[in-house]
């Protein structure tokens, strides 16, 4: 904790503690009120409540929490993460499951940027330090192709391409049951789940979300789909197909059958970023990068095909 002490200025006399503290330290009123409620604010050595009034000349003492350590993408060799394509502007990786795109609060596992750093890639684009080069992301539990910008030119061009939806993003998803129709479009807005802030759901006031799909192969208990995302919302494929009562196999968060997941040997959702196609940021030529299925997804398909 860091201590701050100061006399109350005349101009703040009579003001509520949370309001005056917010003005003095540049905090939000909510943050200032929280400090008072935690007993971290004193006036002349006496704990002050958030609604107490400031007195001119009184000694205001505040215990501030230490600033969190900056997020770091720790360089580490990542088993199974291979380079699918690389040049002076971009690098495309085959991201394994259980790997995050970049460092974030609460995540202590490996990251794509950490793996690239360990492999000798130097990324110095603009943007927040722990997200340098990141132009799109994949869920931790989703495997497949992910492109990272190395040059500032690529970062600018690809950020714009993803924003304006000129990147062709194809996923393969193994879902429970058989969607009807076998090919179609899901147009349903996605927002935060009301009961679980770490989940998403179809919500009336959610963000516009559009998913196109075609059935590639039908099994007794599941269907393999080719999915084309027109938008790119967090958990979009998982939420859309769960809403149709066809969750991704293995996706227990969104209602998948745990018995089927166990039978298929899945400990994560069967969802794979199969390909990305876009105009190269340097010369505009079309680049298409394809990722093969990892072993766990191949194993699940082998079991299903054996049951046919």
Curated annotation (Swiss-Prot):
InterPro entries recorded: PsdUridine_synth_cat_dom_sf (IPR020103), PsdUridine_synth_RluA-like_CS (IPR006224), PsdUridine_synth_RluC/D (IPR006225), PsdUridine_synth_RsuA/RluA (IPR006145), RluA_PseudoU_synthase (IPR050188), S4_RNA-bd (IPR002942), S4_RNA-bd_sf (IPR036986)
Catalytic activity entry: a uridine in RNA = a pseudouridine in RNA
Residues of the S4 RNA-binding domain: 15-81
A GO molecular-function annotation: RNA binding
Active site: 139
Keywords: Isomerase, RNA-binding
One protein family per Pfam: PseudoU_synth_2
Coiled coil (residue ranges): none
Example of a GO biological process term: enzyme-directed rRNA pseudouridine synthesis
Domain of life: Bacteria
E.C. number: 5.4.99.-
Family, as annotated: Belongs to the pseudouridine synthase RluA family.
Protein's name according to its UniProt entry: Uncharacterized RNA pseudouridine synthase Rv1540
Organism listed in the record: Mycobacterium tuberculosis (strain ATCC 25618 / H37Rv)
High-level lineage: Bacteria, Bacillati, Actinomycetota, Actinomycetes, Mycobacteriales
């Amino acid at each position: 904790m860091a201590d701050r002490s100061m006399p109350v200025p005349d101009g703040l006399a009579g003001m509520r503690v949370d309001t005056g503290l917010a003005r003095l330290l540049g905090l939000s009123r909510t943050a200032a009120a929280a400090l008072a409620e935690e007993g971290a604010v004193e006036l002349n050595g006496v704990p002050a409540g958030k609604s107490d009034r400031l007195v001119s000349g009184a000694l205001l003492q505040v215990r501030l929490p230490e600033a969190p350590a900056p997020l770091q993408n720790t360089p580490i060799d990542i088993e199974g993460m291979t380079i699918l394509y690389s040049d002076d502007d971009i690098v495309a990786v085959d991201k394994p499951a259980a790997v995050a795109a970049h460092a974030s609060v609460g995540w202590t596992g490996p990251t794509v940027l950490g793996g690239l750093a360990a492999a000798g890639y130097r990324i110095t684009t603009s943007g927040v330090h722990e997200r340098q080069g990141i132009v799109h992301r994949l869920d931790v539990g989703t495997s497949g192709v992910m492109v990272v910008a190395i040059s500032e030119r690529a970062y600018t061009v690809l950020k714009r391409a993803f924003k304006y939806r000129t990147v062709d993003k194809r996923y393969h998803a193994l879902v429970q049951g058989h969607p009807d129709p076998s090919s179609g479009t899901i147009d349903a807005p996605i927002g935060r789940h009301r009961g679980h802030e770490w989940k998403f759901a179809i919500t009336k006031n959610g963000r516009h979300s559009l998913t196109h799909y075609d059935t590639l192969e039908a099994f007794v208990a599941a269907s393999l789909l080719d999915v084309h995302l027109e938008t790119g919302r967090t958990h979009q494929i998982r939420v859309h197909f769960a809403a149709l009562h066809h969750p991704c196999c293995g996706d227990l968060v969104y209602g998948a059958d745990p018995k089927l997941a166990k039978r298929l040997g899945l400990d994560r959702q069967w969802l794979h970023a199969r390909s990305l196609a876009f105009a190269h940021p340097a010369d505009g030529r079309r680049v298409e990068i394809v990722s093969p299925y990892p072993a766990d997804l191949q194993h699940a398909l082998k079991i299903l095909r054996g049951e046919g």
